[in-house]
Amino acid sequence: ETSYTLNEVVPLKEFVPEWVRIGFSATTGAEFAAHEVLSWFFHSELAGTSSSN
């Protein structure tokens, strides 16, 4: 059994709107295979606004 790890940081705010849905897709061609997402991490930061009164 072969195991692969994919790790990539993508600056999504350059490509997608503020609200999105994320999904996964995988294929092996004509052969059957089971794909499992064993962990998932998502981090989001909103740019804050500051005001001085």
Curated annotation (Swiss-Prot):
The keyword ATP-binding does not apply. GO terms for molecular function: D-mannose binding. It comes from the Eukaryota. Keywords: Lectin, Mannose-binding. InterPro entries: ConA-like_dom_sf, Lectin_LegA_CS, Legume_lectin_dom. Tetramer of two alpha and two beta chains. Belongs to the leguminous lectin family. This is Mannose/glucose-specific lectin alpha 1 chain. The lineage of its organism: Eukaryota, Viridiplantae, Streptophyta, Embryophyta, Tracheophyta.
